[in-house]
Amino acid sequence: MLCETFLFHGYLILVFLSGSVAQFVSNESIKLHDILKPSDTHRLFDTLQYSVQEQYSDSHLSFDVSTIYNYSEKPISIGKLNRKYRDILYEGDMAISYKQLSLIVNGSTEYRKAAKPRLKDKKNLRNKRQAYLDQNYPATIWKNGVPFMFHESLSPSAKAAILKAIHFWYRETCIEFRPRTFQKEYLLFIGNDEGCWSTVGRDASQGKQVVSIGDGCEHFGVTSHELAHALGIFHEQSRYDRDESVTFNPRVVEKDLLFNFAKISPRQMSTYGLPYDVGSVMHYTPTEFSNFPSIPTLTTIDKNLQQTMGQLEGPSFIDVHIVNQHYQCQEKCATLAPCQNGGFTNSRNCKICKCPTGFGGVYCQLIAPSFSKFCGGVLNAEETPRRFDITIRQSTSVRSKSCIYHIKAPDGKKVIVEILKIDSKCIEGCYQDGLELKMKSDFRPVGYRFCCPESSRRRIMSESNLVPFIVYSKEENFSVSFEYSFVSSSARFDDGNIVEDVVIENPDGVFVSDSESSLLQKLGFRKSL
């Protein structure tokens, strides 16, 4: 009897390729056109296209030159790998059933019309619901675990990448996975068709749900992305609140592809109150569906986040958090751990926390460990700028190297970082080698990532007195130099300069606010630069 072995959850699994003990390997021939018909989707795609055109009818071809980078190479693009099926896949890689797509189209158009007169009340709209679910939830999640099968056409590298993704989502959530025996509802991973695509969520009406990992898709970032779809997760830029974080440039997208940029309404999507994450593995690349190789379709409103967009390294902390929320993993713990710095309780060990990147310890109260004892730790900021230089070389058998630091300033102060020089390979998402600075007070989303030389001479101010940062190298040598210091919490940027408004209060009732006032200097007040 023929058999094959796979490493699964740390164990070596023996899979029989013939016999009736298990049905782990399939030889059934199946392709995307066996699941979806263009005639079923075109009318609905046309409706979404019209909706996007109408919503962005006042948009002009507008982009900041600073968002165009001289990339050393183009990273993996799921959209390009799926070019053959552009007319049938939703948002480039989702095999949405006619029923699902109809709900999305109806919800999207109704929400857009209803939201127009309520733009002033965006905050209330945003806080009502936020994560990935529809009115059929929780029937759309795999509550009893995820049975899965491999098609015989899958290459060894594809199988390894799929199993790595399965093990990741098993380890990071409460979801159970198991090779299929005789279950009627299961995931079937195939390699005999082109592209990387998946169905979305559990759909009992389909029985087997297909996930394609074709040639070029055999990477953990891709397989974890497609498996997230199968677990019920949509793309990050589909969020109905995306316009608060990114700007869409419809003029650089072909008219018949605009439907890929429709937003999904709260009726089909919820984000569980978690922040928008440009660094999500579920986010488009900046140039996705662009007619021009270097002109982005999506630009971040915070320009320092532009290089963070489009990573395919693997799921971010927010991605993991959303899946845990979606599958109600916290409910498995009688008592939640007292997590700090945005961490949440690990449902597989309720006494410890899962931590945002840069943090470690049982409760995320510590700095995460670095790969080497020769780097990492605390840097204490002073008013006078201090210089920091680091180089990570790829000269040993260890490929993935990360050095993690925390810059600390006194309470009531902000940290200033000025990047002097970056020497690195420039790619979208900066997920191979780079610098990540967490300048926001919310440490959960991926921070400002930089890997392109154009990032030099950039000055950034934090929102709090703590800045975690990660210097990482996975492919090539990486080096960065920057200066760091602190200013008062009242400091702000004005035409690129740091200005501190000082208010003097005195018994005569005179109030002065003038950062350039010579009077303040005479009185001994000092302006930090």
Language model regions located:
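Metalloprotease/metallohydrolase-associated module, dominated by Zn2+-dependent proteases
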Residues: R242-K354, G360-F371
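Metzincin-family zinc-dependent endopeptidase catalytic domain
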Residues: A114-N144, F150-N291, S400-S402, G412
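Alpha-helical recognition domains of nuclear gene-regulatory proteins
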Residues: A165-F168, E226-A230, S280-V281, I322, ...
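Residues that form ligand- and interface-recognition hot spots within folded domains
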Residues: T5, L12, D34-L36, E152-L154, ...
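Trp- and acidic/polar-enriched beta-sheet ligand-binding modules for extracellular glycan
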Residues: L187-F189, Q307, G447-F450
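Domain-level representation of secreted and single-pass membrane ectodomains enriched
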Residues: C3-T5, A334-L529
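Short Gly/aromatic-enriched secondary-structure transition segments
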Residues: L163-A165, L298-I301, P369, G429-D433
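Primarily auto-inhibitory N-terminal propeptides
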Residues: C3, Y11, F16-E152
